[in-house]
Regions:
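A short gly/proline-enriched turn/hairpin at secondary-structure junctions
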Residues: 64-74, 87-92
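Surface-exposed, charged secondary-structure patches
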Residues: 80-124
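A mature extracytoplasmic/lumenal domain signature
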Residues: 59, 69, 107-109, 116-119, ...
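N-terminal secretory signal peptides that target proteins for export/translocation
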Residues: 1-2
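Sec-dependent N-terminal signal peptides
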Residues: 5-15
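Hydrophobic pocket/interface hotspot
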Residues: 43, 54-56, 63, 79, ...
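Short, low-complexity N-terminal intrinsically disordered segments enriched in polar/charged residues
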Residues: 18-53, 57, 163-166
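Short beta-strand edge/turn micro-motifs at domain boundaries
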Residues: 19-22, 128-159
């Protein structure tokens, strides 16, 4: 009777030892960062150029896209429509340059998180924007499957903003 637990334990150990070892392919994080940087640069170039179709081409089909307003939480189709509508207005012009960009590539090289900060004249010349993006690699292509645009006032300016909103 006492040998039964040992037999079960031995069987489990043998089964675990006989499992094939999965060899992970080494990931070139540097190359992935270059690819993600290129996607982001091209996305922003399309935004500045007012090319809605190019902007949309970088978006993942099952993505989540958030604007600066709390009600702006969109799927790809709704976000694409908003981009297309905004860029159809030829008087609408945006211009900005990325002031700060931080990219983190996941250890498996298949996802990335990007933080970008800039000031965009079309939204506010005084309050910077922080754009958080998540990118996913499928096959050899990277797509943006999450975007969150946020206004990021300086902490010292928050009381002024609160006063202005009274």
């Amino acid at each position: 009777m006492k040998s039964k637990p040992y037999l079960i334990l031995f069987t489990l150990l043998v089964m675990a030892a006989c499992q094939p070892k999965i060899e992970l392919e080494p990931v070139d994080i540097g190359a992935a960062e270059v690819a993600v940087t290129s996607i982001l640069d091209n996305y922003h170039a399309a935004m500045i150029a007012g090319n809605a179709n190019d902007c949309i081409s970088f978006l993942g089909n099952n993505g989540l896209y958030c604007g600066t307003d709390p009600i702006e939480i969109w799927d790809k189709e709704t976000f694409s429509n908003a981009i297309t509508e905004a860029m159809a207005d030829t008087s609408f012009s945006i211009n900005y340059a990325i002031d700060k960009r931080i990219i983190r590539i996941a250890g498996d090289g298949k996802t990335a998180l990007a933080l970008e900060q800039f000031t965009m004249n079309a939204i506010s010349e005084k309050i910077p924007i922080r754009l958080i993006s998540h990118l996913m690699k499928t096959d050899e292509n990277w797509t943006i499957d999450f975007i969150s645009w946020s206004l990021i006032p300086l902490n010292e300016d928050i009381p002024k903003l609160n006063k202005a909103l009274e």
